[in-house]
Amino acid sequence: GNLGQALANYQNFTKRGFQVKALFDIDPEVIGRTIQGAQVFPLEYLEAYLEKNAIDIATLTLPRDRAIEVAKRLCRCGIKAIWNFAHTDLQVDEDVLVENVHLSESLMQLSYRMIAARRKQKKTEETGDTGIGERSD
């Protein structure tokens, strides 16, 4: 999907030592493409690919119902960590690390901080208080 492709295209991963090795999708329009050197395979090839390639971290950017199923498949294949962008907190084997990323929560936090900054700015404009103390020489 779009988020998966955006992450695969992100240049800073490579600069920090992370390499996207392969992508998996169910969309026939995307399967067979190469994105930043990583081929897009059909999701059905997941287990076969992981059997032949040493992959430690998987990134999930799919709908909730598919994410749970794919996470179980990844665990059975020996994945050590999952970076999860699906709209669900994954419950996986104890020895598999999961980082659940909730984009909507992140956006809500950003929005809250922006509103708080606007209120502070408005208060400053109304009171003339810049927050800088006056010197009394």
Model-derived features with residue positions:
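Hydrophobic/small residue at the entry helix of a nucleotide-binding pocket
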Residues: 3
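NAD(P)-binding Rossmann-fold cofactor-contacting core
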Residues: 10, 14-36
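Aromatic-residue detector
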Residues: 13-14, 18, 51, 126, ...
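Phosphate-bearing ligand-interacting subdomains
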Residues: 38-123
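Ala/Thr-enriched low-complexity intrinsically disordered regions
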Residues: 124-130
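Intrinsic disorder/low-complexity segments
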Residues: 132-135
